[in-house]
Amino acid sequence: MAQAEVLNQESLAKQVLQETFGYQQFRPGQETIIETALEGRDCLVVMPTGGGKSLCYQVPALVMGGLTVVVSPLISLMKDQVDQLLANGVAAACLNSTQSREQQQEVMAGCRSGQVRLLYIAPERLMLDNFLEHLANWNLAMLAVDEAHCISQWGHDFRPEYAALGQLRQRMPQIPFMALTATADDTSRRDIVRLLGLNDPLIQVSSFDRPNIRYMLMEKFKPLDQLMRYVQDQRGKSGIIYCNSRSKVEDTAARLQSRGISAAAYHAGLENDVRAEVQEKFQRDDLQIVVATVAFGMGINKPNVRFVVHFDIPRNIESYYQETGRAGRDGLPAEAMLFYDPADMAWLRRCLEEKPAGPLQDIERHKLNAMGAFAEAQTCRRLVLLNYFGEGRQEPCGNCDICLDPPKQYDGLMDARKALSTIYRVNQRFGMGYVVEVLRGANNQRIREMGHDKLPVYGIGREQSHEHWVSVIRQLIHLGLVTQNIAQHSALQLTEAARPVLRGEVPLQLAVPRIVALKPKAMQKSFGGNYDRKLFAKLRKLRKAIADEENIPPYVVFNDATLIEMAEQSPLTAGEMLSVNGVGTRKLERFGKPFMALIRAHVDGDDE
């Protein structure tokens, strides 16, 4: 591609961003991905929920011309994306089983004529022979695969229908592919590249950090009472509560309803029309809280979810990260609350042991152990989360329960040296439970058979409890001094960073283990910019009225972050309105007048 053409496409991309989507600047990583896609090269995009993944294929789709096909796993997610694109004046459509034959034929005709620019479709529909024949006759410019982690068996959400997508590369060798996901570790990334046949792709891994989400943990004592108090403190904010079973979902929703809280149950066992009604009410702010199994969420693009509660601990950090990521997609402050009981972990471990032995079970065990370590962390929870995804960071976040109410610190160098020495002396071949038994001088047959009762480190930690040493080793893992080798049954192994600690050359502070977890405590940190709260409330009311009249979710009109910016800047002209993030040319034409009129009346004091 000629240099002049590349520069022209880059300037067109910025124009599309500003005029169509109403954003003044690209977010970190977006511009590189978009430029690469426009050059015709494959991309793998790993970007957190709310990080702007969709724009990575939507912008090039509008610059390139032709048709971009987007593979998406859920009908609700497709419909939501299409609604938002149509509100921005983009010719988008979807094909799914809920449409009539006439509707489907109309969409197909739009694709054939070049009228449709973005087509959303489920993987199983895309892979039908007759559809692939149609596709071969359309002006296909790019294929985007959303939720791409679903193709990997090592991922936390493997879907067999995604596996068939691997055949597409042979049929479309010249078409650029873009795979997108919010959660993929290194193994899953390699799997996605291999299975989709991505050719020398740009692999763009953005920071996994969601700084606006506060990570909190509450140990379960009287869980339902604690949950009721927590929800009542949220004062009408939108939230999702995840439970591990359908019966618990229904029981929890019923108890919330009995307290006068606007809540509904959602799980795969409910009728389709019931699920659709719950989802629609939630999207439209007619329902405050959805209590759900993990069946709920992937299809949710609601930006103003202010809290996500895990009433039961998830099976892995990937699921936890993805589910908590449904909070605060608008970039405004949000909270992720995990209710934790060690007995829940024990139950999940028992369930896991009932599965067939093999590599998949080993990986699930490793992931479950990592989730347990997160729950029992004595150090900044965000650091534990980011280090799990391979994003080394050492500065505490200041926005989690540990940072806001820090555990007591002590000189942990001696304990660290004892633990590291024991790991080293047992040849870095054993897991945490065994290492702790050697440290505490346990008298069991396995230790005697291995001859480890003769080691100088045997029993050097007997004065401390089992829980104490588990906490110490977990902290050493979180600090990057120890790793768990999943290929060797999570054997503990020292990193290069452990050497100076082992030699006693550097100081090391550890957290005094909280054998009893931190009791719930009010930790309300004030948030929010310098905006007019009264005007914001009026703007929200107007938005809801327009959304109901147009039969669309309120955030499709403007999201909360856009309304806050309006309440901050009080734009009175079209030019001022276009400088607000989230207001593009099409939305200004469609919704601008009533919002500017309301702001004018508020500024003049005419609406009091």
Residue ranges and their predicted role:
Residues 360-389:
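Short, charged low-complexity linear segments at domain edges
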Residues 3-7, 11-20, 24-28, 32-44, ...:
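Helicase motor core with emphasis on the C-terminal RecA-like subdomain
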Residues 1-13, 363-365, 394-608:
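Accessory DNA-binding and partner-docking regions appended to nucleic-acid-acting proteins
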Residues 173, 235, 378, 428, ...:
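Flexible coil/turn residues that form the inter-helical turn or adjacent wing/linker of helix-turn-helix
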